[in-house]
């Protein structure tokens, strides 16, 4: 481990923090890209005859590639997460890359942090492809400053437009939970 220089002024401390934050953000983007590369290497299409013995796993929404089951545990181990957390990370990376391409471009360019892209991906997983495209178009340009409430409104609008049956089912389920005694 390299020795850390002594930071003896406020300016030096802030400069070091900014540099470390920039380095950490760039590393997170590289890991997100690596997750997509890993999924592509282990997509059901790319593993050929081994797919007969290996189960297919949908880790992202409709239209995203299916991956071989074994690859999730290996990836999770490599990033130091549980299998479930690794699957979520892998799925959210694939969701952004394949179903939210405008957002992906902003993430790769460093304009949107990975944590925010993952939050958006998690919200779009259950949308049909057209709904994800709607969210991508409306959210990508402002994703870095988007609040969770704003994201929920855009996702709900996409659900109503592109999956009205599911939107109505969710509305009724929410209404069932309300009661006055």
Segments predicted by a language model, with ranges:
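Conserved C-terminal region and hinge/linker of Rieske [2Fe-2S] proteins, especially
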Residues: 1-181
């Amino acid at each position: 481990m390299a020795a850390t220089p002594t930071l003896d002024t406020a300016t030096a401390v802030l400069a070091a923090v900014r540099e470390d934050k920039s380095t950490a953000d760039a590393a997170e983007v590289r890991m997100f890209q690596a997750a997509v590369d890993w999924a592509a290497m282990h997509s059901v299409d790319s593993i050929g005859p081994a797919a007969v013995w290996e189960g297919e796993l949908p880790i992202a929404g409709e239209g995203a590639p299916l991956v071989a089951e074994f690859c999730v545990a290996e990836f999770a181990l490599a990033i130091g997460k549980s299998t479930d957390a690794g699957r979520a990370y892998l799925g959210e990376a694939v969701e952004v890359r394949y179903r939210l391409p405008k957002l992906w471009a902003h993430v790769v360019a460093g304009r949107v942090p990975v944590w925010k892209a993952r939050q958006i991906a998690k919200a779009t997983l259950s949308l049909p492809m057209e709904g994800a495209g709607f969210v991508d178009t409306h959210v990508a340009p402002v994703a870095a400053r988007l609040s969770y409430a704003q994201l929920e409104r855009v996702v709900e609008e996409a659900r109503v437009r592109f999956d009205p049956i599911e939107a109505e089912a969710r509305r009724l389920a929410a209404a069932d939970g309300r009661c006055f005694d």
